[in-house]
Amino acid sequence: MALKHYKPITNGRRNMTSLDFAEITKTTPEKSLLQPLPKRAGRNNQGKLTVRHHGGGHKRQYRVIDFKRNKDGIPAKVDSIQYDPNRSANIALLVYADGEKRYIIAPKGLQVGQTIENGEEADIKTGNALPLANIPVGTTIHNIELKPGRGGQIARSAGASAQVLGKEGKYVLVRLRSGEVRMILSTCRATVGQVGNLQHELVNVGKAGRSRWKGIRPTVRGSVMNPNDHPHGGGEGRAPIGRPSPMSPWGKPTLGKKTRRGKKSSDKLIVRGRKRK
């Protein structure tokens, strides 16, 4: 999918880019795979704000995605590539030989009419899902499970991928995009290939209103708030934050502070940590 550039006929259009959606083959979603998606505006069930900068935006319906890829032995044909407003990647509608329809994340290079398979006997072909034990070393993969049968959790956004580095006993070594090398059970499933829509990260929003259409509200700097609203607030004019390191609105160290909880049971599965900036 290529980037579309606009003439600077208004200030909002200047430097603005968007995707040309050339890969999209169908605009109407499959009705049987839709669910209502009520707006929360960042509030929990008590009505309290728990996530900032959420609210407004266009009305959406949730597309039910098959992350488990557990329909083995029955081939499926790619019916269409569709846009999904709920994620950065595009989605592909599969029609199985028995008539069932399912959505999957569309990998790079997937074509309409292509046949897709799941299970241990599946070929090493883009879009096929099989256990890590059956995937050769060096293969690019995405939609990787962390626990067998739970469904893919890693490498699901646009352009994401990981690589199989080796096999040790019941574990498979996988290198993630962050540089982290992790051991994952060989019975966990993954999909062959890289997630499509690689140009997504290059899109220039261009104006604030376009973010509001997506349901993203403004992010106000702490330094322009009052001291009762943020640790960086207060002072006369453009005052410094007055602290040795930046703080979150709740007084916790941020911007570089590690947030992963210590002594997690999965720590022993991380062979090499992610790359430092």
From Swiss-Prot:
Residues 35-58, 213-277 are annotated as: Disordered. GO terms for biological process: cytoplasmic translation. It holds the Pfam family Ribosomal_L2_C. SMART domains: Ribosomal_L2, Ribosomal_L2_C. PROSITE patterns: RIBOSOMAL_L2. NCBIfam families: rplB_bact. One of the primary rRNA binding proteins. Required for association of the 30S and 50S subunits to form the 70S ribosome, for tRNA binding and peptide bond formation. It has been suggested to have peptidyltransferase activity; this is somewhat controversial. Makes several contacts with the 16S rRNA in the 70S ribosome. Belongs to the universal ribosomal protein uL2 family. This is Large ribosomal subunit protein uL2. It comes from Staphylococcus carnosus (strain TM300).
